Amino acid sequence: MILSICPPHAALDVAREVAGFNGIYLDANAISPMRAQEIAEFQQRYVDGGIVGGPPDEPGTTRLYLSGDETSEAAALFAGSNLEPVVVPDASALKMTYAAWSKGTAAMLLALRDVARHFGVERELAAEWARSMTYLPERLAGAERSVAAKGWRWAGEMDEIADTFAAAGEPDGFHRAAAEVFRT
């Protein structure tokens, strides 16, 4: 089995590099369902995957969503590990819709902070959040920490999410903008 976990922009190139591999190719990248279909064309035994959660340091914290014809064999390799395999109809679609919220809202908070800073009301916004939406100051702090380390990768993920929204006939502008927030 080849397990591909790389930044979204490299997923197709990695699949091309190993085209013709006869084993299971498990793509667990943050890619759109359309990109997953494109990658499947290069692999005979393709499994679409999507990871939700942080590093699997302990059981129950990280899921590996799987879809495709070879999911049983792929799931068996992770059974009993800290990475919980879960078979779903479309792993990439689930990953995209989950990350649209979890990482998309991080981009929104960062942009809101920057707009408030621009207009000189950052402190006042933080004070209002502390009063009326008590979870947001810590969520913003978490977004600031995460984007410093992972923003470059999340930008590509937002592009993939935007493509997913467009394919579903939904507006894609928010996540295209979120990609720009992560690029700056």
Where are each of the predicted segments found?
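Helical "substrate-binding/catalytic lid" subdomain
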Residues: 94-184
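Residue-level detector of anion-binding/catalytic polar loops
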Residues: 1-2, 45, 84, 122, ...
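Rossmann-fold dinucleotide-binding core
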Residues: 11, 31-103
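Rossmann-like NAD(P)-binding element
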Residues: 1-34
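Short, composition-biased local secondary-structure segments
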Residues: 7-17, 80-86, 128-131
